[in-house]
Curated annotation (Swiss-Prot):
NAD(+) binds at residues 106-110, 130-131, 143, 152. NCBIfam families: aroB. SUPFAM superfamilies: Dehydroquinate synthase-like. Belongs to the sugar phosphate cyclases superfamily. Dehydroquinate synthase family. It catalyses: 7-phospho-2-dehydro-3-deoxy-D-arabino-heptonate = 3-dehydroquinate + phosphate. This is 3-dehydroquinate synthase. GO terms for biological process: amino acid biosynthetic process; aromatic amino acid family biosynthetic process; chorismate biosynthetic process. The keyword Nucleotide-binding applies. It holds the Pfam family DHQS_C.
Length: 360
């Protein structure tokens, strides 16, 4: 078992990575929580596969479990769903001494984090990550969020879990497309980290390679993210680097109305930004080519006709990284050398469209 400790100013917790964790959930939870009521949140995809087994293990370990299931997909990351879940927990008499476990991928992790942070001003939270996106990225670091109609992840909190469990065997039931979109976050982290991690993603050529190397990919990605989060928990500095590809990615993800997965949109965003900065002479052309190759070899998209449209820029204005009319854009000086470039929102159409031929 790999154990990565996240040590913050006011909290410390462990991320455990092992292929046997799905059989040891009750024991793992008992090490950090005393017996209590647990709201076990999942979705309509993960629930039929794993909810019963997890619930039984928790109950055998002395916990009282309230199973909560929401429809799978981004539509559940809403204020309406948050209100419904909080209402169900209140009806069952949950108190501040109880807890919530998010059993699922990025959507459930985000949603569960928001609910846990808001219920009675905060109850204990554990993340059990079942998708690659969650295992390598979203379950670690305490960022939680829901969507409003025109903006992704616009309402949320920083709320750290008490424990994160990552079992790569959960990926066995994940569809190839869902696996690959999570791999986009792995590539992102590897180019930020550089070194042997970036070399590793250069040896991944397809879905089989992702599955075969899932444990190492998760370990490398979580170790890097934990290091960044410990240095900058609230995203005041270097944690912003983890947003590489996301400013453009979030905008086109919303415009695609479900046709693009999150990781697919991030892949497009990374190449769009790197190509633009290569044109300016900041990002080496060889880096952009290496990044593109890592994404395209697993069939991730790297272009979109949605970039540069009026609706695209409207979504960028609403981006949560908009600070005083300026966007902090993450760009790469080299492998393992991210930096922030500030651009005024009003200048973004010229900045993006000047290079649109390379992105369409």
């Amino acid at each position: 078992m790999t154990v990565i400790t996240v040590s913050l100013e006011k909290k410390q917790y462990q991320v455990k990575i092992d292929r046997r964790l799905h059989q040891e959930i009750g024991q793992a939870v008992s090490l950090v929580w005393t017996p209590r009521r647990i709201a076990l949140l999942t979705d309509s995809h993960v629930g039929p596969l794993y909810l019963t087994a997890v619930q039984q293990q928790l109950e055998m370990s002395g916990f009282e479990v309230l199973p909560l299931q929401v429809p799978a997909g981004e539509s559940s990351k809403s204020l309406k769903t948050v209100g419904e879940l909080i209402g169900k927990m209140a009806e069952k008499g949950f108190t501040r001494d109880d807890g919530l476990i998010a059993l699922g991928g990025g959507v459930i992790g985000d949603l569960g984090g928001v609910v846990a942070s808001l219920y009675m001003r905060g109850i204990a939270l554990i993340q059990i990550a079942t998708s690659l996106t969650a295992q390598v990225d979203s379950s670690v670091g305490g960022k939680t969020a829901i969507n409003l109609s025109h903006t992704k992840n616009i309402a949320g909190t920083f709320y750290q879990p008490d424990l994160v469990l990552v079992d790569p065997t959960y990926l066995d039931t994940l569809a190839d497309r869902d696996l690959v979109e999570g791999y986009a976050e792995v590539v992102k982290t590897s180019v930020l980290a550089g070194g042997s991690f970036f070399d590793l993603t250069g040896r991944i050529y397809g879905v089989t390679d992702i599955r075969d190397n899932a444990e190492e990919l998760s370990t490398r990605a979580v170790a890097y993210k934990a290091q960044v989060v410990m240095a900058d928990e609230k995203e005041a500095g270097q944690r912003q680097f983890l947003n590489f590809g996301h400013t453009i990615g979030h905008a086109i993800e919303l415009l695609a109305h479900g046709e693009l997965r999150h990781g697919e949109a991030v892949a497009i965003g990374m190449i769009a930004m790197s190509s633009r900065m290569t044109r300016d002479g900041l990002t080496p052309a060889s880096l952009t080519a290496a990044l593109r190759a890592r994404l395209e070899t697993v069939d991730l998209p790297t272009t979109s006709d949605l970039i540069g449209t009026p609706a695209f820029f409207k979504h960028m204005v609403n981006d949560k990284k908009n600070r005083g009319g300026r966007l902090n854009l993450v760009v790469l000086k080299d492998i393992g050398q991210p930096m922030i470039v500030q651009k005024a929102i009003v200048d973004m159409p010229d900045f993006i469209n000047e290079n649109e031929g390379n992105n369409r």
